[in-house]
């Protein structure tokens, strides 16, 4: 199969979905960028740019915005879903009657679905064992759109789909590394958002660089425990989807999760912090999902548990830190 012959549909016109659409369209591929918001699509069609979520990066001629899901999927084999994790299942359900047996599903969504389900489990339940792939790694949308060097992991259950999708995406400025650990890649992408909130809170409380480094390192340990229980590979932890994305998300203020944590650490109300950011904060939703998963399987994740208490039980951030500092010494 020559992957460039057919258009590719990207479902989700936020900053990350748009950035991936630009990567593909700049390589001359026909890209259909779908949004459920008709007024947003009207704006993109009229202005030739996504001014709402990724301004200053004009659409190439081969990138078209769609609001009609059926039209966006017509004649398409490869679909790339880039919606918030809480909307992932709904999008799969909506597209189910519109696709055929040749369809291949990829996603750039980072998180778990309702019921603490991994996204590949949602796809398999609704669509069967179709070719699937997940894209993850340290990839700020604005830098991808600006054509700054970026490297990501792509994990798939199908070698041909993996090869074709890498060929679609890979370039000198957007490097795609093959991975076969879908479970590890998905779980790392879920936990890193929670840890970004934690490091943001720490920095908002002015706890210093040492504390930030400790949180990232101990957070990686928590991530590893979760990945291990579900059969993911430890090598994934030190790769782009694990350590790479974790470091970026925890240290760069372009990260929405980190900015949200910073605001909480500075004493800003949770709802006010959400409104100020204006886009989905995956860690806010996924803290609940990962916390439930850790409880169910008795996985020790103290940082995740404290972030959950701050977000869902109104625990004061200062008190959360104090309780962590009072924990008994452990072997590293």
Swiss-Prot record:
Q: Where is the active site?
A: 192
Per UniProt, the keywords (alphabetical) are: Cytoplasm, Lipid biosynthesis, Lipid metabolism, NAD, NADP, Nucleotide-binding, Oxidoreductase, Phospholipid biosynthesis, Phospholipid metabolism
Q: Which organism is it from?
A: Coxiella burnetii (strain RSA 493 / Nine Mile phase I)
- What protein family does this chain belong to? Belongs to the NAD-dependent glycerol-3-phosphate dehydrogenase family.
**Pathway terms, separated by semicolons:** Membrane lipid metabolism; glycerophospholipid metabolism
Q: What is the main EC category here?
A: oxidoreductase
Report a single Gene Ontology molecular function. Answer: NAD binding
- What is the protein's given name? Glycerol-3-phosphate dehydrogenase [NAD(P)+]
Top-rank taxon, per record: Bacteria
GO CC annotation terms, alphabetical: cytosol
List the GO biological process terms: carbohydrate metabolic process; glycerol-3-phosphate biosynthetic process; glycerol-3-phosphate catabolic process; glycerol-3-phosphate metabolic process; glycerophospholipid biosynthetic process
Q: Which residues bind sn-glycerol 3-phosphate?
A: 110, 137, 139, 192, 245, 255-257
Q: Where is it chiefly localized?
A: cytoplasm
InterPro entries documented for this protein: 6-PGluconate_DH-like_C_sf (IPR008927), 6PGD_dom2 (IPR013328), G3P_DH_NAD-dep (IPR006168), G3P_DH_NAD-dep_C (IPR006109), G3P_DH_NAD-dep_N (IPR011128), NAD(P)-bd_dom_sf (IPR036291)
């Amino acid at each position: 199969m020559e992957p460039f012959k057919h258009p590719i549909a990207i479902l989700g016109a936020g900053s990350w979905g748009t950035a991936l659409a630009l990567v593909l369209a700049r390589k001359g591929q026909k890209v259909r960028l779908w949004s459920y918001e008709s007024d947003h699509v009207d704006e993109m069609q009229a202005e030739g740019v996504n001014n709402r979520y990724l301004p200053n990066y004009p659409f190439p001629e081969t990138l078209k915005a769609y609001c009609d899901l059926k039209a966006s999927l017509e004649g398409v084999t490869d679909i790339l879903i880039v919606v918030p994790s809480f909307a992932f299942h709904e999008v799969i359900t909506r597209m189910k009657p519109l696709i055929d047996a040749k369809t291949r599903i990829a996603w750039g969504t980072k998180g778990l679905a309702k019921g603490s389900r991994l996204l590949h489990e949602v796809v398999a339940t609704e669509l069967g064992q179709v070719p699937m792939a997940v894209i993850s790694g340290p990839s700020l949308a604005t830098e991808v759109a600006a054509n700054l060097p970026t490297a990501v992991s792509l994990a798939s259950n199908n070698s041909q789909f993996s090869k074709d999708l890498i060929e679609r995406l890979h370039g000198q400025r957007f490097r795609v590394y093959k991975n076969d650990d879908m479970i590890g890649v998905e779980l790392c992408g879920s936990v890193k958002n929670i840890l970004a909130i934690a490091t943001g809170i720490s920095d908002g409380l002015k706890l210093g660089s040492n504390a930030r480094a400790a949180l990232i390192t101990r957070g990686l340990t928590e991530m590893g425990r979760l990945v291990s229980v579900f059969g993911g590979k430890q090598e994934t932890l030190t790769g782009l989807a694990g350590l790479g994305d974790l470091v970026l998300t925890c240290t760069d203020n372009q990260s929405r999760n980190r900015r949200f944590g910073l605001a909480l650490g500075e004493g800003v109300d949770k709802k006010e912090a959400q409104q100020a950011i204006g886009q989905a904060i995956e860690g806010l939703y996924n803290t609940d999902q990962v916390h439930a998963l850790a409880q169910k399987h008795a996985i020790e994740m103290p940082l995740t548990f404290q972030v959950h208490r701050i977000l869902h039980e109104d625990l004061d951030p200062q008190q959360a830190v104090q309780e962590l500092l009072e924990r008994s010494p452990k072997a590293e």
